[in-house]
């Protein structure tokens, strides 16, 4: 069974609506469905909720450490409650899936996602489950950092939100450990693909600009919010 459900993102209102926070959006939706309230827990470096379910207690977690040190939070809670990697599900934004699609998988590499990279390192294992929430790709590798820290266009946000709503039908299966049933529910229904964002021409050049959002400001004294596609 899944005993710990984690959503990845960056803390703070400036990041709340950005693509990189799709994991937070998912945990928020699960918390509403399970009638749970997240609260700050310094010992686990995140927002936490404990939910009593028919199959036992389940923890919800949103690390507040910034993306690239998410593993600090996940490992702290998992070790204290003796939760094995295969009992952990991490929901995160996925560049390689279009908005509105999702995939469930266990194990594998981090594919450049620094949140997953740190969880790998802190847990010492890659055996945890991942719920990959599609956000689409900007089409240019150099623009990935700007893209994930930008807000999705309305049509894309609606597709991601609808995907999250559909995923809630699999929560019971995830909690009971019926991963085949959960996978079937998560993978069978695919929505129409939203249109890609329209390139905006750079003034006076006729060349489309790849980025759709400004860079997030640096935050003094905090870990940088590094992202998928950043160099190690």
Swiss-Prot record:
SUPFAM superfamilies: Peptidyl-tRNA hydrolase-like. TRNA binds at residues 15, 66, 68, 114. Transmembrane segments: none annotated. Residues 200-220 have a biased composition (Low complexity). Its EC number is 3.1.1.29. GO terms for molecular function: peptidyl-tRNA hydrolase activity; tRNA binding. The record marks 93 as: Stabilizes the basic form of H active site to accept a proton. The active site is at residue 20. The record marks 10 as: Discriminates between blocked and unblocked aminoacyl-tRNA. PROSITE patterns: PEPT_TRNA_HYDROL_2 (PS01196). This is Peptidyl-tRNA hydrolase. It comes from Methylibium petroleiphilum (strain ATCC BAA-1232 / LMG 22953 / PM1).
